């Protein structure tokens, strides 16, 4: 297990800190499950217990006992499969056992609604930030950059001062899944906020390029949960004013969804949106086009052809008073 995390995930796969934490949590939950449901203490757990039936039961337990969503279940499943595919090479004598576990399929669920904020919703949330305090100015800069860049929360928290180019063309370099780098253009207004933030926090010095761009009170990089806390704080305030604009549940990822939807609604090509978001395939980006009913309606209206068939001014049944009264009585 130690080699899997330190050698394979970190050195060979180049997994992000977010991925490593997610995998770590998966195995912590697995140990909890074995201890609670199989009555085996952690020090007595052996590889012989790692069977397909045990893993499937564990995934079911996540849903039933921990109230995990299907998406979370599938993330845990992916972590397990990654580890046991690794074990095929590390322990080939039990190859069939590891292959069985690796064959577990992700669970299909109902097509969930893609939550995103309208432009008014984003504005309302940002308006709740108190820019009279240094913490508030940090929060506004962070949230504006999160939205404008379409970054994942893990990409945001891993930013350093040197990730930002404050000269034209304004860009931020994000490190995404698999340590893949992508350069995303940033609006001038947002970059002005970033530059002011750097100056106020004495970060506009070349010697501080490796410092975290957004940190907590101890100078450590802000965590994903820290960003989520900030967002939920302002979302709660905004929800009181206009509950119809702010979903009951909100996470940092909603800024990414919102940015993609707003670009799409503005007529930006899906291929360009794909590059901003760092998707491997444009098929992944197409979820935004499928989610926007307004765009579907506009497309149908644009494709409408008048076939010359029109509704008569007076319906045939309206000519017959008795028939009309009869039909109305059915209601």
Regions inferred by a protein language model and the residue ranges of each:
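Conserved catalytic core of the tyrosine transesterase superfamily
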Residues: 1-331
